A protein has these predicted regions:
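Catalytic Tyr-X3-Lys loop
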Residues: 102-121, 140, 164
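The beta1-alpha1 cofactor-binding region of Rossmann-like NAD(H)/NADP(H)-dependent oxidoreductases
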Residues: 42, 62-73, 106
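Conserved glycine-rich Rossmann-like NAD(P)H-binding loop of the short-chain dehydrogenase/reductase
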Residues: 30-47
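Conserved glycine-rich cofactor-binding loop
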Residues: 9, 16-18
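Amphipathic alpha-helical dimer-interface segment in Rossmann-like NAD(P)H-dependent oxidoreductases
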Residues: 76, 115-135, 172-173
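Conserved mid-core segment of classical short-chain dehydrogenase/reductases
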Residues: 72, 95-110, 153
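C-terminal helical subdomain
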Residues: 181, 185-186, 193, 201-236
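Catalytic loop of short-chain dehydrogenase/reductase
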Residues: 94, 132, 136-163, 168-177, ...
Length: 236
């Protein structure tokens, strides 16, 4: 435990596993109180226990990000308890089925955009005021290289990440002269997650980096000053 983020309140979506869990754990290890969100309470409790065992502090908030009312209620709860939010990590996402663009299933496409884009806008809208109350509000959004570099069969997921990047960067431009809020796009690169295993079922997981490496890169970046619109690409 160190105290680099002592007094900071952080919220991480998709915090029950993978990059989200690793990032939440790393932030807590630096002294932040971390609000953990995901759909499954049991998995969140395991991350919370690990944080407590390491001497950190956390609060779990099980919710479905596609339920805008749940997000609004969480924002009210954070306002009442802490009155600010210093770090918001938008990590939760779904991959969907990799397929040619003409073969994309319309219903799945709608679900994918609901989580990967619409829910992210609702998160930004719901926590904007709390981020502005921080003396150094930071909003991070996890993306993928396919958001900026089109790749065959990745059209649905790539389009959702391109939309997310644009949304976050527009928000950053809107608030940069009105507050201390700064936005960051994080491209984690090849990382050992359940989503990557689904996308690359034949890949040897030992050949790609652990989520903790991405989390450490995020923490180190948050210790520095940077302009809004910063892009962090985690190599390896």
């Amino acid at each position: 435990m160190t105290n680099a983020f002592a007094g900071k309140i952080a919220l991480v979506t998709g915090a029950s596993r993978g990059i989200g869990a690793a990032t939440a754990t790393a932030l807590a290890a630096q002294g932040a109180h971390v609000i953990l969100t995901a759909r499954t309470a049991k998995d969140l409790e395991a991350v919370e226990d690990a944080i407590f065992d390491a001497g950190g502090s956390a609060t779990i908030a099980p919710l479905d990000l596609t339920d805008g009312d749940s997000i609004a209620r969480l924002a009210v709860a954070v306002t009442e308890r802490w009155g600010k939010l210093d770090i918001l990590v938008l990590n939760a996402a779904m991959l969907g089925t990799l397929s040619p663009v003409p073969a994309i299933d319309g219903a799945e496409f709608a679900r994918l955009f609901t989580l990967n884009v619409t829910a992210q806008q609702v998160m930004i809208a719901s926590f904007d005021a709390l981020l502005r109350k921080s003396d150094a509000g930071r909003l991070l959004a996890l993306t993928s290289s396919v958001g900026a570099t089109p790749r065959a069969f990745w059209g649905a997921y790539g389009a959702s990440k391109a939309a997310l990047e644009n949304l976050v960067e527009c928000y950053g431009e809107e608030v940069k002269n009105l507050s201390q809020v700064r936005t960051v796009i994080v491209d984690p690169g090849r990382t050992r997650t359940a989503m990557r295993a689904k996308a690359y079922p034949g890949e040897d997981p030992s050949t790609v980096k652990e989520p903790s490496i991405v989390a450490d890169a995020i923490v180190q970046m948050l210790k520095t000053e940077f302009a809004t619109g910063h892009r962090l690409v985690v190599e390896g």
